[in-house]
Amino acid sequence: MLFPLVRASSSKGGIVLADLRYALRQLLRAPGFSATAILTLALGIGANTAIFTLIDSILLYPLPFPQQERLVRIGYGGAQTETAFFPKGWIRAVGDHSSSFAAVSGFGPDTESNVGEAGAPARIFGAEVMTNALDTLAIHPAAGRFFTPEDGIAGHDPVVVLSYGYWQEHFATSPAAIGQTIRIDGVSRRIAGVLPPGVRFPYADTRFLIPVTFKGGDAVDPWLQFNLRAFGRLRDGVTPGLAQAELRGLQKPLLALFPWRMPDIWASEMTVEPLLESQVGSLRPRLLLLFAAVGLILLIACANVANLTLARAAGREREMAIRGALGASTRRLVRQLLSESATLGILAGAVGLFTAAASVRALTRWLPADTPRVQEVSLHWPVIVFAAGASLLAGFLFGLIPALHMARPKLGQALHAGSRSVAGKVGQFRVSMALVVGQIALSVLVITGAGLLLHSLWRLSQVDPGFRANRVVTAEVSLDASACQAKGHCHAFFQTLLERLHGMAGADQWALADSVPLTAQAGSYVYDAEGHPRDARQGALLATARTVTPGYFATLGLTVVRGRLLQDMDLSGATRAVVINQRMAQRLWPNQDPLGRQILHVSDEPQPAVWVPAAALTVVGVVNNTHENGLAGDFADEVYLPLTPAREQPVLYALLRTRTGAQAAAEELRNAVAGLDPHVPVTRVRTLNEVVAASVSAPRSLAVLLLIIGALALAIGGVGVYSLIAYIVSWRTREIGIRLALGAQKRQIVQAVVRQSLMLALGGSAAGLIAAAFAGQLLRRFLFDVRTLDPLTYTLVALLMTLLALLAAWIPARRAASVDPIKTLRME
């Protein structure tokens, strides 16, 4: 029994190889058709593979940590854990009280520091982490050691852990680097260890880590550093849901540990989600939307190539009829034709893979720099498998209908010399028309989505940010963090810099601030307000806080609604003045005069809800609302605090309303800073218009990518319409010649061709717009101030498809009108 099976198997294998060899010969005999089909399919396969590469690398590829599924992020208030911040004391308390976590830790924001000798420091990103952070990740150092609990005690020998990339670039991966010192923000730190290769923690651009420190014996210190993100490793068998339920049960006891009252958001429910999801969850809907769009591109490409294959079938009907007459079964013919389609698909897949690789490189450079895991994007083996699968699927999709059509030819008709009559092609034309209508419908679906996103982006760009961005330049001026240890030094430096800015020839207005609008850098202000109930059992109030010099309001063009702005006399701190925005005034004291009212930071209360008039700030003015956390968001309560000696800090932003242009003003600023201290770097120089543009980078990148995909869909769909109309005109040349000979006008011939093209476009557009009306609900979360059934977008898409149909019909219509009836009849 074995030998017959082997013979049968080898026989089948031989047939498959023979089919493939024959398929290659057929494709080589039609190089024009083959090249067109391969390129069309390669566009669809390449686009799908490129987006799948992003999905695989960003959403699916595991983090480089052992048992990464047990790593979670902790948040509160139902908000994304990415925006939840905790004090180090709370994180430590969770680790002590919770039984769900094997370890709980935290890390600070991604901040730039002066790294190197005082004469030539470089600005490099680093982060503070709690000493158990790297052990929580369960990773091992590439060299040296990680932090120990002693490293987290204030006054202990300062240490640093380097990223593998920094170690490689600056120390050539030499083990001798361990124990050496580097200067970070004026502090000499001993290199304790190096992260393993491939680990980017906690941010993609982090180059070094320093430990969060605790002051022993200070009961308040653990609650002051309120900028840590919390994460943990779950115990075996514990799910994020179980950990979340436990944290919600512990929420009130943990909240009671704070030395002051917290805002109401802290009384809302805690959240626990996988670490990977916390990093990329916000990106998932956008990537899936793009994947759906490029999936439609592949369907459009398959329909286009199916039509090309049907057109080519006209020249092969005689061949198929003869093979059928010689005994080839329909199944055998279908298999042969599908072999040709599969070969085309595989060749297109190979080209598409190269196209995808180039597209991925371009995408990773073009996407916003803060896109999660964008530096990790590469072609892993699942991408190769996906490309191969997409190639075979494409070959099946575009090859099946032509194969079924070609495998059942009518022998008499195929061998008849006059078989070019339209009557013999009615069935083929109907199939081709259906495919073209489908192409147009899918193209309309994609371009409508792109149109809605573009309209939304335009509406977003029309939002008034609340300040005048034109001609304003911002720049970061960075002293060493250790400079403020000498009380008053940082404040004196920036006060002197402010005086020098007054003499700048290139600026009309100037100011210093601790943050720039629309960058989400502003701090939080937790307070009680005069006239509002104060109860130790209730949450405190919360506002966004910005520390500024008096010129800030004029530089940004903010409008005084009531009272006055901050003045130079407020910089000493004696007046205890504060300016608030309209929203805060209306929310706290509706229909009342806010001037003279007082607010008190909770840290200035000796006991929760105990008012101390001498420590309170007095509202001296109200200004218009400005957007802080994005143009699409609602206004938040804002307080503007004067830059007093008590609020000194090592890093401030200079804001200049320029006369001479951004570059000239920035150079003047650098000279002014260098005149005070040539070693202080001036970085992040950009215009406020660039800041505003960066704030909408995510919706802009999505809209532009979908527009590119939509343009590709239109191009393929337009070619499909043109090819079909041209093919029909070619087959109806005899009929057109006879009609012209019988007196038909050329105008009538042109109208008939254009009418047919418009009917195809009308049918496809109607189907596409109906589909878009239903699919538009999926876009709702991406739209700003635009309805999913936006009449402007739908009208423009309909007009665009009409124009496309006219353009696609123009050349075939002219060709039809130029038919010579005499030559046509003579050929008959």
Regions found by a protein language model. Name each.
Residues 1-9, 112, 126-149, 158-288, ...:
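Mid-to-C-terminal secondary-structure elements
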Residues 301-345, 423, 719-761, 765, ...:
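Interfacial "coupling" helices/loops that link adjacent transmembrane helices in transporter permeases
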Residues 51-53, 306, 341-414, 452-455, ...:
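Small-residue-rich transmembrane alpha-helices
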Residues 31-58, 62, 300-303, 345-349, ...:
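Short, strongly hydrophobic transmembrane alpha-helices
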Residues 2-35, 65-66, 77, 112, ...:
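Membrane-helix entry/capping segments
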Residues 63-112, 225-231, 273, 460, ...:
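Membrane-proximal extracellular/periplasmic loop immediately following the first transmembrane helix
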Residues 11-34, 275-280, 308-335, 339, ...:
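Alpha-helical transmembrane segments of integral membrane proteins
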Residues 43-70, 310, 359-369, 442-471, ...:
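Alpha-helical transmembrane segments
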